[in-house]
């Protein structure tokens, strides 16, 4: 996988993610579908910050999750979610810009409290823990939006609320 391909792949998903976060900023941030679930605001912040993790995968040979905080921040406003996401995107782009392709094939290890959990190439780590992880939680967030009776953006095709393409015209 090349750095150029990875950047294009990430950017395509970031565009869709921004559309979901644009809607989420107007949602009741404290709402939760279940007591065991994140609040909508906390889930949106998690989605917003994930792109910044690209830095951890392009620097050093490992990352220890046990050294982190207590999970996503609780936002005070929708504007904070969008600002966090914009900063995360900037950090992701900076981490990937100028990155040599061979660096992406180097080994990288995810750990928790010093215990290795998974070892893979940097490219696979970014694909799995940034891109696919963001897409997974973005999908959860679209369900939250639907349950709050907010419009779900068209992402890969039309949604029940938004058309991705204009309607076809009769010939």
PLM features: residue spans?
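Helix-adjacent hinge/juxtasegments
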Residues: 56-57, 61-101
């Amino acid at each position: 996988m090349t750095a150029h391909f990875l950047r294009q792949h990430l950017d395509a998903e970031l565009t869709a993610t921004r559309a979901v976060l644009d809607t989420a900023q107007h949602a009741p941030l404290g709402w939760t579908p279940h007591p065991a679930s994140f609040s909508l605001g906390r889930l949106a912040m998690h989605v917003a910050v994930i792109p910044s993790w690209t830095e951890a995968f392009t620097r050093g040979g490992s990352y220890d999750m046990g050294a982190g905080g207590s999970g996503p921040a609780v936002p005070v406003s929708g504007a904070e979610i969008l600002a966090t996401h914009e900063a995360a995107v900037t950090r992701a782009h900076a981490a990937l810009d100028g990155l040599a392709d061979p660096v992406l094939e180097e080994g990288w290890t995810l750990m928790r409290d010093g215990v290795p959990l998974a070892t893979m190439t940097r490219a696979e780590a970014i694909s799995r823990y940034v891109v696919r992880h963001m897409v997974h939680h973005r999908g959860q967030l679209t369900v939250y939006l639907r349950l709050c009776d907010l419009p779900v953006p068209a992402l890969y095709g039309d949604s029940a609320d938004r058309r991705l393409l204009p309607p076809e015209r009769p010939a």
